[in-house]
């Protein structure tokens, strides 16, 4: 796993946690992007690809 893939995995976990805590997707996405150095499009794509 590359560093970018690892960051994306962590960001996806963070995004899902914030959504589970009641944040709406746009706010959770912004908080995650502010906290972690990941590409917005890659994170949204990973989120949309979840089962």
Segments the model singles out, each with a brief description of its role:
Residues 1-51:
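C-terminal alpha-helical interaction appendages
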């Amino acid at each position: 796993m590359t560093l970018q893939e690892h960051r994306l995995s962590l960001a996806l976990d963070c995004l899902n946690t914030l959504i589970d805590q009641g944040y709406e997707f746009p706010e959770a996405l912004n908080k995650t992007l502010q906290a972690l150095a990941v590409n917005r499009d890659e994170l949204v794509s990973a989120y949309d690809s979840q089962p």
